[in-house]
Curated annotation (Swiss-Prot):
The gene is trpp-3. Pfam families: TRAPP. Its main location: Golgi. One of its GO terms (cellular component) is cis-Golgi network membrane. It is found in: Golgi apparatus, cis-Golgi network; Endoplasmic reticulum. This is Trafficking protein particle complex subunit 3 homolog. Keywords: Endoplasmic reticulum, ER-Golgi transport, Golgi apparatus, Lipoprotein, Palmitate, Transport. Homodimer. Part of the multisubunit TRAPP (transport protein particle) complex. Belongs to the TRAPP small subunits family. BET3 subfamily. A lipid is attached at C70 (S-palmitoyl cysteine). GO terms for biological process: cuticle development involved in collagen and cuticulin-based cuticle molting cycle; endoplasmic reticulum to Golgi vesicle-mediated transport; intra-Golgi vesicle-mediated transport; multicellular organism growth; protein secretion. The keyword Iron does not apply. The lineage of its organism: Eukaryota, Metazoa, Ecdysozoa, Nematoda, Chromadorea. The keyword Lipoprotein applies.
Amino acid sequence: MSKAIKQNLADSKKMSAELFCLTYGAMVTEMLKDYEDPKDVTIQLDKMGFNMGTRLADDFLAKNANVPRCVDTRQIADVLCRNAIPCYLGISATASSWTSGDREFTITLEANPLTELVQVPAHLVSAGLSYSQLIAGAIRGALEAVHFKVYASATDTGANTEIRIRFDQVLKDSLPAGEDD
């Protein structure tokens, strides 16, 4: 592939990221007008992210057949930070702030693409808007798709975004009603 074609591909990915960021910002603005309460917008962003995450889990597993099955939260954090987040957001992430028992940790995104071109007003943040909750919801949805129930919340700290993840339980496979083994 020629150098010019590679440069054009890189430029188109950057344009796509910028377009996504601006479109996301416009969508959140419209949601704030529709819902009026920033907490309700955060709930809706979480639901949207959850629905995206359930679909992204299948896509991720199809593209990454060599990723081992996770059996604990440290492995989950490792796969999220080394594979999933760089794959879908194009950024690096780190896991830290583990609680005793390894049931809760924080993923730090140092360059959140959603907040790259946006400055969220402080009064909306203090009123309960979590602008990056879409990402936390996507992580929650993806993990639920692979049978891990977690709680996830996002906090934008200005310089970076922190996603706090708390493990709740391993979900059991269940057959639809009326079907037995």
